[in-house]
């Protein structure tokens, strides 16, 4: 990638021969003397050399040639063409030959002359080391190549040829491994730099041109599946754009005319025409690439300390090694070979590659990881400061709040100016401003048929922390907060303190207040969550805003009063003063802002965070961290990343030092192993690189995989910690709830013989739950499949063993604290945005209370029943119910089957049943289109305004001598055509209610055919026979089961749509 500025060009080179910072001086001394080279930057972690040069004086190929003369394996990096590929996939021929010969030399015990192959192996791998050493010596620099060359020469002098061969092989192999290990980081940087394509298509002619040649205000065409090459505004078309590469947002963003689009983002579907607003080199992605590039050269205090130590460490160890070899020789000590070997071990250990790499490689990986998630951290020093933050100060407008204002009130003061004239003046002056309030006022004026004319405004001026000024039609207009009135010399200011939660603006002209307006703003989604996360990290959060105290207090209340301090009505200098006080009182301070007013405070803070793309250019340039999106939840993620990076650097430093000390200690203890010293040196470098690259991995994905895997083997836990899960409590062995969060596991809920089992599946998939059969006459089994459900169920702990209590809550909190008798059952099915209240204190001991709250419903239903067993399956979707249903009947068992799908009507009917009735009321067919109610002739006639779906049989028919204990078996089947829902009909079925307005009762659809068959009676057998005749032959064997056959592909269960209903067979 090349950035041109006049006759200069910035070129990028991959230099694989750079293995540690000790070779940086060599590269600089090779290139800086060349004519036309203006600046040389070496980035060791990514093995990149950036050269600013005159293209007429020296070309890229000449620079590559100069680097390769020192065997640095340089090549030109080409961004944007997608051709970046893995280089050095295999070791060089020198390394392969060296290794092969070294293996042959290992068989010298079988044939002694084979030992010479080790010497040949050393000679075969030396050429790259020798050439680099010569280049370093010519420029009077001491690097690792010279140290390794001396170590090889010393081993050969001691006639330890195998040692010499191992030194060369280990060093060259480790260099290749380091290159391969760091390729991922280099590839990540290449992808970041080449996000924007190098070509663009002109919308008018269809001509393909270079992106860098496209001028501002040129309309370019972007088709579906293409990457937007230049920043701009959509002028035609609509589409969804994936901005994850730039902002880290995972969801596509809808774009329509007047929407801003950014270079490097992907147009998913649809054609759009974009008018460019910047040159390719000044696009957001280009700025991001430059910031990351500059950040790599910004050293932290830890890195500067290590570099300083390394500067003196290498010469000191070289002198020590020379002394260890020279002094015994001069003193004519015995066993000189041992002292020479010890000197060589010290010499190899003189290169602090791993120690010097410990900080920059970790910093590089952290900066790249942050950039991938929409965080631009400008250097290792910022990352280090971010890890020690104790206080976070937030601006309000556009940071904590959305910055998307709405005009609540706009009115003139007095009779001097009309509303239309006032709107014209305000909108015209505000059209010159970039403040978030400005566009809202302009839009409001246009909605009142007032067109602003910014060209008529002169002498426009911004007063930070106060407002703006402009002259139009000979009148000087001041617009801003209360302070602007002092500047406008207004004598009277109205008292507006009683207006809570709004931002108050004033309009003044000629020393007189002529207008007042109020704007409201809401907190961003995730603001409270971000502040809570910071608090969990031990970071105090405060608000600094120039807005009114009322607006600041309102925002604090919206956040749940989680801010430690709130400072309102501040000027920019006040924010700077408070940030300084926070630094002195609490420690390192972080400041988050998005506007020009925040720039001084951002610069004053230890770490300033701007809102990036949406923020002002001044704030982005002044800040130390830029958010490429408006999600401030990335701030605690940045703090976590910084702290994790700090820990990684500490581990790298400790490991680097310990390995050096261990090798030297081993040598002084009488075991001077040169090959071990080489392995410790280059091997430690490799391990430091690999450990640092763990920062590139995403921790959340590993946790999610771990959670998903654990739930396959542990059905009882069921993702209790997930955001979409539910909380359930076990009540004395009576009720066990299994709540499955967003895991794709199939969970079975088990219970004791006297317990009730409720299995709730809350997920974002179409999952099905299979549950084993449970045998007991008093058991109740309910299986509810909820999609996108959030549940919080609280159940009483003082239930008896036959109590049945289920709390099913979708997007709701349903609580029951009543004391239940052992024959009571309480079902609370709370659905989306519903409130369910139960009052059971007035009920007799045998009462059964059922409350089904649906979407936007408030339901209170006292129910009195004599029942010992009950099966309830309720399917409600998009219901709006407000009903009170007193029901009284004497039943031994009860079965109610309600199938309501997409019916926005009321089905509340009332029927008073006499005790021990033997009448049969089968379920009726429901149809959206044909609003008819079909009744079987065996059922009693009901009034026209009642819709009853009841199936009753005498009490003595329930008991069966051959089946004293009921067996409940539940199976789940899925069909592309239909879903069948079966229930046991050996119980009485009843749905009796009353609705005050019969006209609101609408029959359900006909395509869902529902039958309740009770074949234990003669009437039930007649119904079975009728099923044979009514094209339901396949279901004749299931006559005594209640089933639903629906032709629709999607069903509902408990007001949750698009949930595939299981087939439930109760036998």
From Swiss-Prot:
It is found in: Cell membrane. Its main location: membrane. Belongs to the cation transport ATPase (P-type) (TC 3.A.3) family. Type IB subfamily. It catalyses: Zn(2+)(in) + ATP + H2O = Zn(2+)(out) + ADP + phosphate + H(+); Cd(2+)(in) + ATP + H2O = Cd(2+)(out) + ADP + phosphate + H(+). Residues 9-75 form the HMA domain. GO terms for cellular component: membrane; plasma membrane. Residues 724-735 have a biased composition (Basic residues). The chain crosses the membrane at residues 94-114, 117-137, 140-160, 162-182, 313-333, 342-362, 649-669, 673-693. In roots, localizes at the pericycle cells. In nodes, localizes in the phloem parenchyma and companion cells of both enlarged and diffuse vascular bundles. Keywords: ATP-binding, Cadmium, Cell membrane, Ion transport, Membrane, Metal-binding, Nucleotide-binding, Translocase, Transmembrane, Transmembrane helix, Transport, Zinc. CDD domains: HMA (cd00371), P-type_ATPase_HM (cd02079). Residues 760-774, 975-996 have a biased composition (Basic and acidic residues). Residues 711-739, 760-790, 960-996 are annotated as: Disordered. Disruption phenotype: Reduced plant height and biomass. Reduced grain yield. Decreased levels of zinc an cadmium in grain, rachis, husk and nodes. It is an enzyme of class 7 (translocase). It is a multi-pass membrane protein. Pfam families: E1-E2_ATPase, Hydrolase. One of its GO terms (biological process) is transmembrane transport. This is Cadmium/zinc-transporting ATPase HMA2. One of its GO terms (molecular function) is metal ion binding. Zinc/cadmium transporter that plays an essential role in promoting translocation of zinc and cadmium from roots to shoots. May control cadmium loading into xylem. In roots, transports zinc and cadmium from the apoplast to the symplast to facilitate translocation via the phloem. In nodes, functions to load zinc and cadmium to the phloem for the preferential distribution to the upper nodes and panicles. Its EC number is 7.2.2.12, 7.2.2.21. It comes from the Eukaryota.
């Amino acid at each position: 990638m090349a950035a041109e500025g006049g006759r200069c060009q910035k070129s990028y080179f991959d230099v694989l021969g750079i293995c540690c910072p000790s070779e940086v001086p060599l590269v600089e001394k090779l290139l800086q003397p060349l004519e036309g080279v203006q600046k040389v930057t070496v980035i060791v972690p990514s093995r990149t050399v950036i050269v600013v040069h005159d293209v007429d004086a020296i070309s890229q190929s000449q620079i590559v040639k100069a680097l390769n003369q020192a065997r640095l394996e340089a090549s030109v990096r080409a961004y944007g063409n997608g051709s970046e590929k893995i280089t050095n996939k295999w070791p060089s021929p020198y390394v392969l030959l060296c290794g092969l010969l070294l293996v042959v030399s290992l068989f010298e015990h079988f044939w002694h002359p084979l030992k010479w192959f080790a010497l040949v192996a050393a000679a075969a791998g030396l050429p790259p080391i020798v050439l680099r050493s010569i280049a370093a010596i010519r420029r009077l620099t001491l690097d690792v190549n010279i140290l390794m060359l001396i170590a090889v020469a010393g081993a050969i002098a001691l006639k330890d040829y195998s040692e010499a061969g191992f030194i060369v092989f280990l060093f060259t192999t480790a260099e290749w491994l380091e290159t391969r290990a760091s390729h991922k980081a280099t590839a990540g940087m290449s992808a970041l730099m080449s996000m924007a394509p190098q070509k663009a298509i002109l919308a008018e002619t269809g001509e393909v041109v270079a992106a860098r040649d496209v001028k501002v205000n040129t309309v370019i065409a972007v088709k579906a599946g293409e990457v937007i090459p230049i920043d701009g505004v959509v002028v035609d078309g609509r589409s969804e754009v994936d901005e994850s590469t730039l902002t880290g947002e995972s969801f596509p963003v809808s774009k329509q005319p007047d929407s801003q689009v950014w270079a490097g983002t992907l147009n998913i579907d649809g054609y759009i025409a974009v008018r460019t607003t910047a040159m390719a080199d000044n696009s957001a992605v280009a700025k991001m690439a430059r910031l990351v590039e500059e950040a790599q050269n910004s050293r932290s205090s830890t890195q500067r300390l290590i570099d300083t130590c390394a500067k003196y460490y290498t010469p000191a160890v070289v002198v020590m090694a020379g002394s260890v070899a020279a002094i015994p020789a001069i003193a004519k000590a015995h066993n000189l070979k041992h002292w020479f070997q010890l000197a060589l071990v010290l010499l190899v250990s003189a290169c602090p590659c791993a120690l010097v790499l410990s900080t920059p490689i970790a910093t590089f990986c952290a900066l790249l990881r942050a950039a991938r998630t929409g965080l631009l951290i400008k250097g290792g020093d910022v990352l280090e400061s971010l890890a020690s933050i104790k206080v976070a100060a937030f601006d309000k407008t556009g940071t904590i709040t959305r910055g998307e204002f709405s005009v609540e009130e706009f009115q003139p003061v007095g009779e001097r100016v009309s509303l239309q004239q006032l709107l014209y003046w305000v909108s015209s002056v505000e059209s010159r401003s970039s403040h978030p309030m400005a566009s809202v006022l302009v839009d409001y004026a246009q909605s009142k048929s007032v067109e602003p004319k910014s060209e008529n405004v002169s002498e426009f001026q911004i007063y930070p922390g106060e407002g703006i000024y402009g002259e139009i039609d000979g009148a000087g207009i001041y617009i801003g907060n209360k302070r602007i009135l002092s500047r406008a010399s207004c004598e009277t200011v109205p008292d507006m303190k009683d207006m809570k939660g709004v931002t108050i603006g004033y309009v003044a002209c000629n020393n007189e207040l002529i207008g007042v307006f109020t704007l409201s703003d809401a907190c961003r989604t995730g603001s409270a969550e971000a502040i809570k996360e910071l608090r969990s990290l031990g970071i105090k959060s405060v608000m600094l805003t120039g807005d009114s105290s009322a607006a600041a207090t309102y925002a604090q209340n919206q956040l749940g009063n989680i801010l430690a301090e709130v400072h309102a009505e501040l000027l920019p200098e006040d924010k700077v003063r408070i940030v300084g006080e926070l630094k002195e009182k609490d420690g390192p301070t972080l400041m988050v802002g998005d506007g020009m007013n925040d720039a001084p405070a951002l610069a004053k803070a230890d770490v300033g965070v701007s809102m990036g793309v949406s923020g002002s250019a001044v704030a982005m340039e002044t800040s130390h961290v830029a958010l490429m999106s408006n999600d401030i939840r990335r701030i605690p993620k940045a703090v976590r990343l910084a702290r994790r990076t700090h820990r990684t650097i500490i581990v790298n430093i400790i490991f680097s030092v310990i390995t050096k000390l261990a090798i030297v200690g081993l040598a002084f203890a009488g075991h001077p192993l040169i090959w071990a010293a080489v392995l410790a040196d280059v091997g430690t470098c490799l391990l430091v690189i690999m450990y640092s690259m763990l920062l590139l991995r995403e921790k959340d994905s590993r946790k999610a995989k771990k959670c998903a895997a654990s739930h396959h083997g542990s059905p009882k836990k069921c993702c209790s910690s997930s955001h979409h899960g539910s909380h359930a409590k076990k009540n004395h062995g009576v009720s066990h709830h299994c709540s499955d969060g967003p895991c794709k596991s199939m969970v079975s809920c088990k219970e004791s013989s006297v317990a009730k089992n409720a299995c709730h599946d809350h997920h974002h998939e179409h999952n099905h739950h299979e549950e084993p059969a449970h045998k007991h006459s008093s058991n109740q089994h309910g299986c509810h499949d909820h999609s996108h459900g959030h549940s919080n169920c609280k159940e009483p702990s003082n239930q008896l063993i036959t109590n049945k209590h289920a709390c099913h809550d979708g997007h709701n909190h349903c609580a029951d604290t009543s004391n239940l008798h052992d024959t009571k059952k309480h079902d609370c099915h709370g659905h989306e945005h519903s409130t369910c209240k139960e009052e059971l204190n007035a009920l007799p001991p045998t009462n059964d209370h059922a409350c089904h709250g649906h979407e936007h419903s408030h339901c209170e239903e006292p129910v009195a029943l004599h029942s010992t067993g009950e099966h309830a399956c309720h399917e409600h979707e998009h219901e709006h119910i407000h009903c009170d249903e007193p029901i009284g009947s004497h039943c031994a068992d009860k079965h109610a089957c309600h199938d309501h799908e997409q019916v926005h009507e009321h089905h509340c009917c009332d029927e008073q049943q006499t005790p021990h009735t033997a009448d049969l009321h089968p379920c009726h067919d429901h149809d959206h289109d044909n609003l008819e109610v079909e009744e079987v002739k065996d059922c009693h006639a009901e009034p026209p305004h009642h819709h009853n779906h009841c199936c009753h049989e005498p009490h003595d028919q329930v008991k069966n001598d051959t089946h004293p204990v009921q067996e409940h078996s539940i199976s789940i089947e899925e069909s592309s055509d239909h879903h069948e829902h079966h229930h046991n009909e050996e119980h009485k079925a009843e749905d009796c209610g009353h609705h005050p307005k019969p006209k609101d009762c609408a029959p359900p659809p006909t395509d869902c055919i529902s039958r309740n068959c009770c074949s234990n009676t003669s009437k039930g057998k007649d119904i079975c026979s009728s099923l044979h005749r009514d094209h339901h032959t396949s279901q004749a064997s299931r006559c005594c089961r209640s089933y639903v056959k629906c032709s629709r592909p999607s069903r509902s269960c408990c007001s949750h749509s698009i949930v595939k209903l299981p087939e439930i067979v109760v036998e």
